[in-house]
């Protein structure tokens, strides 16, 4: 590429890090790292009404958890928060006012509402109509004096070139253009409180920080022509733009909504449940991009090497919770036991299950976990007297030979001394029951598994029985025999 790559992630500190914003950050990160460019973070905190205490820290903390790093941010650079840059915005507001490219607007909110209602009744497209239209200089001066005397604080509006065409070649969407006459008239670049509006401030920031490429969600497409107007008014070259497609719910086919309860949507939720950050990073990287081929498990280094902006999808990205859970399970299965056990400790401790067998339990159930917090429901059988059964499990336990199998295996366990009760000696006892009773296959193994664990599927049965313990296993079998005899 001919110019230095400088990209940014610019969140508003208005809450937790959402999966959509995390994707924006991640794609900018991958793009910068792939091309040897600069990835920076800027905080857009001019919307004071939506400002959340600790929102900035939460954003940065969760990005770090995902495994991202950055080259510039408010932590290392001054004036990387918009609230620290008000003097800079004012400088360019004053310049545009002096050049006649912007003007002070004294229209009240009540007048704007009334005009919108009139336009609606008349079937007109809603738009702001310049309040000075048709006024002479004397009338304009008198109008301003009257409004200021009434204590009305003005906004500042950009004078829109309604005959202008604002177009760009989008990195994802291809050629896009808007007519200046279709964006709603002259728009506010500075609010009454002196703060700039988003579409003005972001241009000043991106130019000042020499941003080369703006990669963001396609909900920003409608903002782009307004931003191009500011670039034009100030005589600056605009960066390249790329607008990623929406993330949709794979079950509903609609835009992912914070009201969708079937998906976890905030990075904090994944942290709390014990997902591995590498798994979440991998999953998000494939939301609207793929490197080609059938492989889906990639390390961060592989994703950086493979990332190609030309493969950003033009179709909506489906958020599939089941796919994420499959991917997470793959990462947990392949992680070392020490890592997963350390992650599991807080869950085990809170449940009162951090016993001397805890690490063995984690090792036993690690291949089944989609998130580490699942260690609690997975190990319920070790801390209860009688496991609850599903209808399918109850049906198995109504089999004619079930009592025979359970009585025979209980007798084998009772006959084992403590020093003989080890994992490798348990399977031979099950085979001995087969030899004595002539019962084999599912009719042999399934009743024992369900009686001991309350599950039709799970880890190796001898491992489960050993960790449950001889006495507890016998107790579970006795409880099951009582249950099926009712």
Swiss-Prot record:
ATP binds at residue 258. The keyword Cytoplasm applies. It comes from the Bacteria. HAMAP family: Glu_tRNA_synth_type1. PROSITE patterns: AA_TRNA_LIGASE_I (PS00178). Keywords: Aminoacyl-tRNA synthetase, ATP-binding, Cytoplasm, Ligase, Nucleotide-binding, Protein biosynthesis. Catalyzes the attachment of glutamate to tRNA(Glu) in a two-step reaction: glutamate is first activated by ATP to form Glu-AMP and then transferred to the acceptor end of tRNA(Glu). This is Glutamate--tRNA ligase. Monomer. Its EC number is 6.1.1.17. Transmembrane segments: none annotated. Belongs to the class-I aminoacyl-tRNA synthetase family. Glutamate--tRNA ligase type 1 subfamily. GO terms for cellular component: cytosol. It catalyses: tRNA(Glu) + L-glutamate + ATP = L-glutamyl-tRNA(Glu) + AMP + diphosphate.
């Amino acid at each position: 590429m001919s110019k230095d790559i400088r990209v940014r992630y610019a969140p508003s500190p208005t809450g937790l890090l959402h999966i959509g914003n995390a994707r924006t950050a991640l794609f900018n990160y991958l793009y910068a790292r792939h091309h040897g460019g600069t990835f920076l973070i800027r905080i857009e905190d001019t919307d004071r009404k939506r400002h959340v205490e600790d929102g900035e820290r939460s954003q940065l903390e969760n990005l770090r958890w995902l495994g991202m790093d950055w080259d510039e941010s408010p932590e290392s650079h001054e004036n990387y928060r918009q609230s620290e840059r008000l003097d800079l915005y004012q400088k360019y507001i004053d310049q545009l006012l002096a050049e006649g490219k912007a003007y002070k607007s004294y229209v009240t909110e009540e007048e704007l509402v009334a005009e919108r209602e009139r336009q609606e009744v008349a079937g007109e497209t809603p738009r702001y109509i310049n309040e000075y239209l048709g006024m002479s200089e004397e009338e304009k001066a008198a109008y301003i004096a009257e409004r200021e005397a009434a204590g009305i604080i003005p906004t500042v509006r950009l004078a829109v070139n309604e005959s202008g065409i604002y177009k760009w070649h989008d990195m994802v969407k291809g050629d896009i253009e808007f007519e200046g006459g279709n964006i709603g008239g002259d728009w506010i670049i500075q609010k009454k409180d002196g703060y700039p509006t988003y579409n003005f401030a972001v241009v000043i920031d991106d130019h000042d920080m020499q941003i080369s490429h703006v990669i963001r969600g396609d909900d920003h497409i409608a903002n782009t022509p307004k931003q191009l107007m500011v670039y034009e008014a100030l005589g600056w070259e605009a960066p390249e733009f790329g607008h990623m497609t929406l993330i949709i719910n794979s079950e509903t086919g609609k835009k992912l909504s914070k009201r969708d309860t079937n998906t976890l949507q905030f990075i904090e939720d994944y942290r709390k449940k014990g997902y591995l950050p590498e798994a979440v990073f991998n999953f998000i990287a494939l939301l609207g991009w793929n490197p080609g081929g059938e492989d889906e498990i990639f390390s961060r280094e592989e994703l950086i090497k493979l990332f190609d902006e030309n493969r950003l999808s033009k179709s909506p990205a489906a958020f599939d919770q089941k796919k994420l859970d499959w991917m997470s399970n793959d990462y947990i299965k392949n992680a070392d036991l020490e890592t997963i056990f350390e992650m599991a400790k807080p869950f085990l401790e809170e449940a009162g299950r951090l016993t001397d067998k805890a690490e063995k339990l984690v090792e036993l159930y690690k291949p089944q976990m989609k998130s580490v917090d699942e260690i609690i429901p997975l190990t319920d059988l070790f801390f209860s007297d009688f496991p609850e059964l599903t209808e399918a499990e109850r049906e198995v336990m109504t089999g004619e030979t079930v009592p025979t199998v359970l009585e025979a295996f209980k007798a084998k366990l009772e006959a084992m001394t403590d020093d003989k009760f080890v994992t490798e000696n348990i399977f031979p006892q099950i085979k001995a029951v087969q030899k004595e009773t002539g019962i084999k296959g599912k009719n042999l193994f399934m009743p024992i598994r369900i009686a001991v664990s309350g599950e039709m599927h799970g880890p190796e049965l001898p491992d489960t029985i050993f960790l449950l313990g001889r006495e507890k296993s016998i107790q579970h079998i006795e409880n099951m025999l009582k249950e099926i005899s009712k």
